[in-house]
Amino acid sequence: MSGYFITFEGGEGVGKTTQIFLLAQHLYGKGYDVLTTREPGGTAGAEVIRHILLSGQVQQHYGPLIEAILFTAARIDHVSEVIMPSLQKGKVVLCDRFIDSTRVYQGLNDKVSSSTLAVLECLALNKIKPQITFLLDIPARCSMKRANLRREKAETIDYFEKDELKIQEQRRQAFLQLAKQEPHRFRVIDGTDTVEVIAQQIRDICDQVMLDQLP
């Protein structure tokens, strides 16, 4: 497969969307064909599922397993209809959240067993995996402040942003643990730095890693 797959992970309000936009502009300037996308979402069908999931109705009425299954359904559609075809065409795909968010959000405290999540992941991935995952890491208190500010500005309404500080910190630690388990894929970025400092770090990493792998 001739393309390159980069994902962005982290808690709420860490700045993933901003950094994806800035990296896309950088890569466009270098002549790469870039696709930006997100999860849950990325296709018409997956966006419908996104709306349901972020409303919190599934978690409240059906529980974490059904929630994980719906995330997987959205991912299957997203991978088969958008990510895989784009990679086959040689595009650089930048995705806001992917498998690691499912591992953290649905797997935290064994809400859904790791074995079940592994099966769902296998169904969805079609053998693809990100070459680089940027983990934007900020303290949970900072994450909650940013998420609250975003809600006040009516930029988004997200069920997961409403979770208490303890849960947010547990998710942060779970992401960091994943990064320790797969250091070849993860790049942990201090999300408390300025937007430009973070963007430059990400650009430098991509330029170095992708130099010998893409034309």
UniProtKB/Swiss-Prot annotation:
UniProt GO BP: dTDP biosynthetic process; dTTP biosynthetic process; dUDP biosynthetic process
PROSITE patterns per UniProt: THYMIDYLATE_KINASE (PS01331)
Sorted UniProt keywords: ATP-binding, Kinase, Nucleotide biosynthesis, Nucleotide-binding, Transferase
Family annotation (InterPro entries): P-loop_NTPase (IPR027417), Thymidylate_kin-like_dom (IPR039430), Thymidylate_kin_CS (IPR018095), Thymidylate_kinase (IPR018094)
Top-level taxon of the source organism: Bacteria
Reaction(s) this enzyme catalyzes, per UniProt: dTMP + ATP = dTDP + ADP
Binding of ATP, residues: 10-17
The family this protein is said to belong to: Belongs to the thymidylate kinase family.
Biological function: Phosphorylation of dTMP to form dTDP in both de novo and salvage pathways of dTTP synthesis.
Protein name: Thymidylate kinase
Name of the gene this protein is made from: tmk
